């Protein structure tokens, strides 16, 4: 498995995650200072720190069942690459140093280990089709999976559910795990939904 120390790619040579450290107030995500990043290094560091925090937040809400699920962030400099969790790392333990940078062809560009094929397929296809999107989250939470078996849209019966009314997609033609470009048909519903 390729590691950050032996990856000899032009992109890996340009990335230094020790640069661009951002100021913090207090502790935890609520203490983060939202700044207008001026340098690419600051933008990258800002994104990967929040990505690592997002994994821990998902874990705190129980969205980390087994090895399924992933969250990614499009690199601010290399737009055909995205930061994501490597396969087998638990959300609750995720650190910036654990994240890997993958290109849309499934190649590890920076990091210790690559992500799984399913994550690669889902995230790269969304980023290819939606250049306006800079982050993608995919999870299998208990209640989400349970509700999905009903194959129904969420109804606006509470204030919280109103945020998702007519903004969710259901997939009725499931034909297996999303491991390649053929599975892109599962993701097409996202192209027409107004987010």
For each predicted feature, which ranges?
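Class I SAM-dependent methyltransferase SAM-binding "motif I" and its flanking Rossmann-like core
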Residues: 142-183
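Extreme N-terminal flexible tails
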Residues: 2-38
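An anion-binding catalytic pocket shared by soluble metabolic enzymes
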Residues: 41, 48-135, 144-157
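Conserved small/polar residues in nucleotide/adenosyl-binding loops
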Residues: 185-192
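Glycine-rich, charged/polar anion/phosphate-binding loops
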Residues: 123, 183-184
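Short histidine-centered catalytic/ligand-binding loop motif
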Residues: 40, 111-115, 169-177
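Short alpha-helix carrying the canonical HExxH Zn2+-binding catalytic motif
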Residues: 139
